[in-house]
Amino acid sequence: MLKIEGLVLASSSKYRLALLEQIGVVPGEVVSPNIDESLLKGELPRRYCMRMARTKADAVAALRSDKFVLGADTVAYCGKRVLSKTESEDCAVRYLEMLSGRRHRVCTSVCLRSPGGIVHERSVVSVVKFKSMSKGEIEYYISSGQWRGKAGGYGIQGFAGALISWIQGSYSSIAGLPLHETYCLLCGYFDLKHIP
């Protein structure tokens, strides 16, 4: 593991930190950004995702201007409809019923902001297909509480992973941080090549 004191992760997600650690990187600090995550009228899902990742990085960079700041955001969507982070059981049930037996997309955007204000952004869009879920499977998932605060009402890292019949794209991106793209961005500034 390489602890990078000059890197701040702008996130409140323990999963993003764990994903970053998978590529051998430990940020010097983790700061939860306090931002407005409201969707703008007419805003398309990918644009929204990119804006949120950059807004998170910008908000934390305003507090840590001498550091590199890494922000990310994940958005699940069906067509143009953004499936926001779920905070209620009713919302999670609605999302899961809508996603049952269907494909949807998950976009994760990552933004790296340098101390000099240079911004690098990448986005990865993946396709996810849930199996046709029974009422019992949905109820079990809801009772697990794993839906809380998750885009689309699920996290692929938990039991929901057993309900997903296939994905096209990046597993790590669906989980919250596209590792290949993040690694490439960080390699532009930090020597990560010695990490096994």
Swiss-Prot record:
Keyword NADP among UniProt keywords: no
Transmembrane spans: none
GO molecular function, one term: nucleoside triphosphate diphosphatase activity
Places the protein is found: Cytoplasm
GO CC entries: cytoplasm
InterPro entries on file: ITPase-like_fam, Maf-like
Pfam families the UniProt entry points to: Maf
EC identifiers of the protein: 3.6.1.9
Known cofactor(s): a divalent metal cation
Keywords: Cytoplasm, Hydrolase, Nucleotide metabolism
Entry keyword Hydrolase: yes
GO biological process terms on file: nucleotide metabolic process
Family as reported in the entry's similarity comment: Belongs to the Maf family.
Record HAMAP family: Maf
Protein name as it appears in the record: Nucleoside triphosphate pyrophosphatase
Organism field: Anaplasma marginale (strain Florida)
